[in-house]
Amino acid sequence: MKTLIILCAPCGVGKSTIRELIAQRNQLPDFACIDTDAVGLNWHVYKGTERENQYQTDCLKRADEISGDKNIFFVSAGMNPPNFYNYVDLPELIGRTFFIGMTCSDEEITKRLKARPAERRTDSDDFIKSQHEYSAWFKGSRGKFQLFVDNTNQTLEETAGLIEDFIKSL
């Protein structure tokens, strides 16, 4: 049975950057490091349809296929514990699931989102506000995660190290 580790966080907190660094450092050779953006599914195809709640399940099924025989370190903005437990039908090969929540200060989220390329459409006040609100949910829901990281004052290497150490301890 596979182990599934889900790193979830608001946009602009550094999920994808941390995933890339963890993959490069190769400290977790038994894990495939997979980002939601890399599974080949588009949220906008599901959004507002009767299949909206199927998106997370389809992403995980695809991640399971991509991972081959390896465990899965999966990075997602939307696959937080409530969404996972309410909407996801797990592939049968997944035996254990752990959640890592990550956030940073609202100021840091704003700075990071405004620095992204315009085509990512993350620099509007409404979008940034939505990520601040999502971040507040994370901060108020620390206990829903087996590991919770506030990376406001941490380097990428420190954050990656915390996550790697947690996963190795399982």
Residue map of PLM features:
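Switch/connector loops and helix/strand junctions flanking conserved nucleotide-binding motifs
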Residues: 106-113, 158
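Small-molecule kinase domains that catalyze NTP-dependent phosphoryl transfer to phosphate-bearing small molecules
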Residues: 119-162, 170
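The Walker A (P-loop) glycine that initiates the GxxxxGKT/S ATP-binding motif of P-loop NTPases
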Residues: 9
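Walker A/P-loop
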Residues: 16
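Glycine-rich phosphate-binding loop used to anchor ATP phosphates in small-molecule kinases
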Residues: 54-96, 102
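Conserved substrate/cofactor phosphate-moiety recognition/catalytic segment
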Residues: 19-66
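Short hydrophobic/aromatic beta-strand immediately N-terminal to the Walker A/P-loop
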Residues: 5-6
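Walker A (P-loop) phosphate-binding loop of P-loop NTPases
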Residues: 12
